[in-house]
């Protein structure tokens, strides 16, 4: 983290139209933009000098691209609060090492002058392995349009991998919660003759999971934080309406996992249906765990998967399973439904 001359070069090259970005000692050429949101842009980039990253001892060799292409996230930072949030994301991302969690390969935060006001601001560049098949959300939406769906065993294999990544986070001391588990934060890579590879990403909302709430003020602060960092259709009830005296823990992620399993099957959160109803309230649907199942004579998935979702979507956190319980259960289902 921090600033360097090479980091400043990233700014000047971009302004002059060179299309090259330096992240510390490695230079990357921007190939094309992959996406954007808020103050962040994601680009497909390619190493200008081959094998530059391969010489960094801190990077797992399995994360080095064969063709030198990577994903680069550029974040425009305008306030000190935003700067601290980016630093927090970098710190947290650097903690994790698991096949189903997206690794942060390198990063740089650089000072730049604002183009209009001339004030000193910052830009952050975060480098990751690239997964061009898109997110689980992208794929699920495309399949819904074509009236297609994953097979039961593929649903379970994808879900099992997300659980594996989350278990790694929950196993820290103290445990970390992701706080924004959803299909849009799961990258998918198709593999010939194997189930798709699923990788949980975006640790901008990840924090130590356990927090003691001792007052109404603290409860309201948590609700406000959750409204900004936890996607509403996948947000646990205790983050919508937090009691004044309660212990919050990693079971907020378990609720989101239940919503995600539903979404892998049906392409949407189990509660978003209310947004299409007159006077419908997403918060009330979540607080009451009002899951709406698709109707039809021939449901595409067995009742055991529906029961699995319901097990995770318990309004009271103490009634939800932990990640180890979930993994044991999904492994049993994989054995049951394997061809």
Residue ranges and their predicted role:
Residues 1-23, 31:
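Juxta-kinase regulatory segment immediately upstream of eukaryotic protein kinase catalytic domains
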Residues 31-38, 42:
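Protein kinase glycine-rich loop
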Residues 103-122:
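Short beta-strand micro-motifs within the conserved protein kinase catalytic domain, predominantly
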Residues 118-135:
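Conserved short submotifs of the Hanks-type protein kinase catalytic core
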Residues 170-190:
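Catalytic-loop of the protein kinase fold
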Residues 184-230:
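Activation segment/activation loop of eukaryotic-type protein kinase catalytic domains
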């Amino acid at each position: 983290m921090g600033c360097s001359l090479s980091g400043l070069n990233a700014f000047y090259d971009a302004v002059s139209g060179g299309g090259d970005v330096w992240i510390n000692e490695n230079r990357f050429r921007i190939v094309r933009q992959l996406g954007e949101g808020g103050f962040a842009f994601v680009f497909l980039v390619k190493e200008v000098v081959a094998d530059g990253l391969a010489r960094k001892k801190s990077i797992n060799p399995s994360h080095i691209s064969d063709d030198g292409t990577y994903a680069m996230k550029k974040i425009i930072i305008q306030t000190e609060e935003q700067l601290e949030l980016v630093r927090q994301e970098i710190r947290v991302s650097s903690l994790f090492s698991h096949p189903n969690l997206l690794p942060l390969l390198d990063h740089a935060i650089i000072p730049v002058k604002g183009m209009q006001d001339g004030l000193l601001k910052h830009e952050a560049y975060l480098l990751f392995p690239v997964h061009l098949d898109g997110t689980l959300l992208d794929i699920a939406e495309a399949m819904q349009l074509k009236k297609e769906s994953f097979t039961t065993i593929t649903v379970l294999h994808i879900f099992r991998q997300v659980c594996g990544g989350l278990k790694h986070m929950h196993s820290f001391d103290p445990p970390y919660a992701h706080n924004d588990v959803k299909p849009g934060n799961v990258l998918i890579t198709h593999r010939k003759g194997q189930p798709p590879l699923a990788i949980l990403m975006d640790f901008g909302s990840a924090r130590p999971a356990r927090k003691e709430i001792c007052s109404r003020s603290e409860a309201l602060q948590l609700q406000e934080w959750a409204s900004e960092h936890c996607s509403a259709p996948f947000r646990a009830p205790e983050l919508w309406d937090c009691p004044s005296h309660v212990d919050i823990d990693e079971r907020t992620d378990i609720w989101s996992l239940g919503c995600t399993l539903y979404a892998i099957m049906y392409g949407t959160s189990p509660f978003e249906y209310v947004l299409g109803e007159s006077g419908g309230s997403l918060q009330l649907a979540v607080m009451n765990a009002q899951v709406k199942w698709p109707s039809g004579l021939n449901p595409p998935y067995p009742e055991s998967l529906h029961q699995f979702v319901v097990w995770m979507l318990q309004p009271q956190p103490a009634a939800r399973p932990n990640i180890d319980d979930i993994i044991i259960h999904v492994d049993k289902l994989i054995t049951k439904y394997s061809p």
